Structures are given as C-alpha cells and as structure tokens.
C-alpha cells in the first residue's frame, strides 16, 4: 500500500500543486475567510464527505478558559468540516488547517505579487503558501488519495478547515471542538519543516500607559515628556528580555525555534505633533514563557520589572504607569512524547520519508494546543516554508509531497492501531 500511495501522489502531484495555487490566490486575510471556505467546501464535496458548517457561537466559546477574543465578529465566518466515515470502529483522526493569513503589507517589500501563487523551481510563492495553505491542501489530498485508491479506512477521518488561527483560534479550532468534533488524535499541518512539534510556549500580550504633561516645544521645560519617561520602562524590559533569553531554556524550543523565550516590544505610540511635548506614551508587548512557568508568575514578573524601573522618579511616583493585559493569553502546551499517538506518528513518518524525524517545540502558538483541554492527543507536522508572515513567503513543493505521503500512510496506521 505504501508504494501505491507514493505512486498515486507522484503521478497526480500537479493537481496538488495547482490546488495550492488556487487557494493562495484567494485573499483570505483574517476576518475575510469566507471565499476561501466556500472553495474548501467544494473540495470536500468532491470527496463526498459529510459536511458541517460551524459558525462560532460567541457566548459558548468565550466561556472557555482557552478562548482568545480576536475582536472580529463571527457572523458569516464559518468553519468547514468534512467527515469520511470509517468502515469499522477504528481510531478516529482530525487533520486540521487554517485558511486565514496575515496581511502581506507592505507590498513594496515583496519582489512579486503576494497573491500570485507563482512556482519558481521547487518553491511556490505567496502569502499563506506555507502558513498554512499548503498543509491544508495536503490534508485534503492525503484523504483523496486513499479514497481514489479504494482503500477502506477503519476509523472516521475529519478534515477541519478553520478560521482565525492567526488571531488566537477562538472562533476556529476551539469552536469546532466545542461543538463536539473531537477525535482520538489531532494533526495540524503547520509549516514546521518536516519536524514533529509537540509543544509550544505560553503567550501573553500586555500594554503600558505612561502619562506626561503636554506643553509647547518652546516651553518644553514646563512639560513632562511621556516618551522620555517610557524609555526607562523600555530599557528595563529589554534587559529582562536579554536575561530570559540567556537563562530560560526548554530543550524542545531550543531545537525548534533556536531560542526558548522572547519578549517582543511591538508597538509604541506617543505624541501627535512635533512641536508639542507628548502627554502620553503607549507601549504594547508580547512575552513568551515555557512549560513550568505560569501566567500568574509571568504577569507578576513583567509588572515588577516595570514598576521597579520607575522607582525614584518623582513624576512617576505620582503618576505610575498603568499596565493592562489583552489579546493572547495562553498557557504552554506540552504533548507527552511517549504517547502511542506520537510514537506511531514518528515511526510512520520515518518509514515513509526514509530519514529521522526531529521532535521539537515552538516559541509561537498554534491550534494543536486546544487538544489538551479535551483529553486528546495532538501534534504538528508540515512542509518546509520560508518567510512566514514576511515578504516572499514560499513553500517547498517536494516537502508538500512528503507531508501528503506521511499523512495518507498515517491515516491507515492510526485507524487500524
């Protein structure tokens, strides 16, 4: 069977690549996913899958402890699920992908049209090509391969095409699981370079407000410059970032991301006129943390760092910085590497590809984390990508073929295990 699968995919890979081109050309920036979901619905219909369209229910998902509010209304934004029923009582499997992408702007940084789907050599280019439309289509093509070959699959296979992973996954993967679409195993084909990801860091966003006092630039001595006051906080957070990068280590993250934790200061807003002393400065940051660290202790660490940095400043003593937490707030995810689901996947992938699969973790989040709330097993495995979220994003097509082969074989092995 392994050779039949390999031959089918090799002989039909142009259809696989063409389908990836089709979806890359759909501008499915987070919040505007429905054109892409209509396309995926048609692809699932081609396989005669049992279709479910899931429009997230805010009241339901927002009550879940893992929910992240994207701030984007759920109306007319559906998740598409296609189910292939097993012929017996074999193990069930979800293969997951998200249709949403981040904006490609600024366009001037690209050397080509971000929505072109152009193929140059072994690489297919475009926003979302790697993250993660190639994986999404590999999922579909792996199941299509087995259906076209007429192989009876023992357990149910669910294909999940979801929205808003880039914004936290609350209305996407979480909404599907909350509606009861839970299986024995869960694979997300994120572009993780043919490595198997079983863990990711916790993530939290924070915002700091610093108050100043406005004045005319010609009388700046009468004002309090909020930017200058914010610089003390910036410096302290930079020092914290450097210290954590050197001292906080988690082996799986070191393998997968090259550094276990990051503290990124991503947004700084201050002032509205060059001749006015700025009266307010606002800083937004993202801090990552490893399994074993908790949200509560990381919050305290950030808050203590900020407040200590302004000690002794007469203005800041009377007008202390205000700290708030918003957006992403997730605990770390860690899948037991000794679980049979994981061990069988590695065994299968190494057998199909003919080389060792490295088990890694990632500093960035993904939808597989939601499985831990349902007592199920999850992992990520996907193609080789470059420049995700950046200009000239691309995916390596030979790795897409590898992923599709691995998935098709694993569907059989897992369902019969």
Report each predicted region and the residues it spans.
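Acidic-glycine-rich active-site phosphate/pyrophosphate-binding loop
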Residues: 104-119, 198-209, 347-348, 379
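Acidic/His- and Gly-rich active-site-bordering loop/insert found
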Residues: 1-124, 153
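Metal-dependent amide/peptide-bond hydrolase catalytic core
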Residues: 1-4, 11, 46, 74, ...
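Residue-level recognition of well-ordered beta-strand positions that form the cores
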Residues: 83, 96-98, 162, 205-211, ...
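Residue-level signal for inorganic ion chemistry
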Residues: 23, 27, 44, 190, ...
């Amino acid at each position: 069977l392994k050779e039949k699968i390999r031959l089918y995919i090799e002989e039909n890979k142009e259809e696989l690549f063409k389908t990836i081109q089709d979806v890359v050309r759909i501008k499915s920036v987070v919040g505007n996913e429905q054109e892409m979901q209509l396309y995926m619905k048609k692809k699932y219909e081609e396989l005669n899958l049992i279709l479910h369209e899931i429009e997230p229910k805010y009241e339901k998902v927002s009550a879940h402890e893992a929910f992240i509010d994207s701030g984007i209304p759920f109306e007319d934004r559906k998740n598409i699920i296609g189910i292939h029923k097993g012929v017996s009582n074999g193990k069930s499997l979800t293969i997951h992908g998200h249709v949403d992408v981040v904006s490609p702007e600024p366009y001037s940084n690209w050397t080509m049209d971000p929505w072109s789907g152009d193929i140059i050599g072994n690489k297919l280019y475009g926003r979302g090509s790697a993250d993660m439309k190639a994986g999404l289509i590999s999922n579909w093509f792996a199941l299509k391969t087995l259906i076209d070959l007429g192989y009876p699959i023992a357990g149910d296979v669910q294909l999940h095409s979801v929205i808003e992973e880039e914004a936290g996954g609350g209305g996407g993967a979480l909404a599907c699981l909350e509606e009861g679409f839970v299986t024995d195993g869960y694979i997300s084909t994120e572009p993780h370079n043919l490595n198997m990801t079983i863990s990711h860091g916790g993530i939290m966003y924070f915002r700091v407000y610093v108050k100043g006092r406005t004045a005319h630039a010609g009388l700046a001595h009468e004002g309090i410059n909020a930017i200058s006051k914010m610089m003390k906080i910036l410096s302290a957070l930079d020092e914290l970032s450097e210290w954590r990068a050197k001292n906080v280590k988690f082996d799986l993250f070191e393998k997968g991301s090259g550094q276990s934790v990051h503290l990124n200061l991503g947004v700084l807003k201050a002032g509205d006129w060059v001749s006015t002393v700025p009266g307010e400065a606002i800083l937004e940051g993202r801090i990552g943390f490893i399994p074993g660290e908790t949200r509560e202790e990381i919050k305290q660490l950030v808050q203590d760092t900020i407040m200590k940095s302004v000690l002794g400043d007469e203005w800041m003593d009377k007008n202390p910085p205000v700290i708030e937490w918003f957006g992403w707030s997730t605990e770390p995810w860690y899948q037991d590497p000794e679980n049979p689901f994981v061990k069988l996947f590695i065994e299968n992938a190494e057998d199909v590809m003919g080389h060792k699969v490295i088990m890694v973790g990632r500093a960035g989040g993904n939808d597989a984390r939601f499985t831990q709330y349902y007592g199920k097993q999850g992992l990520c495995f996907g193609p080789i990508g470059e420049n995700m979220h950046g200009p000239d994003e691309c995916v390596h097509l030979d790795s897409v073929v590898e992923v599709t082969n691995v998935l098709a074989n694993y569907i059989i092995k897992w369902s019969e295990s």
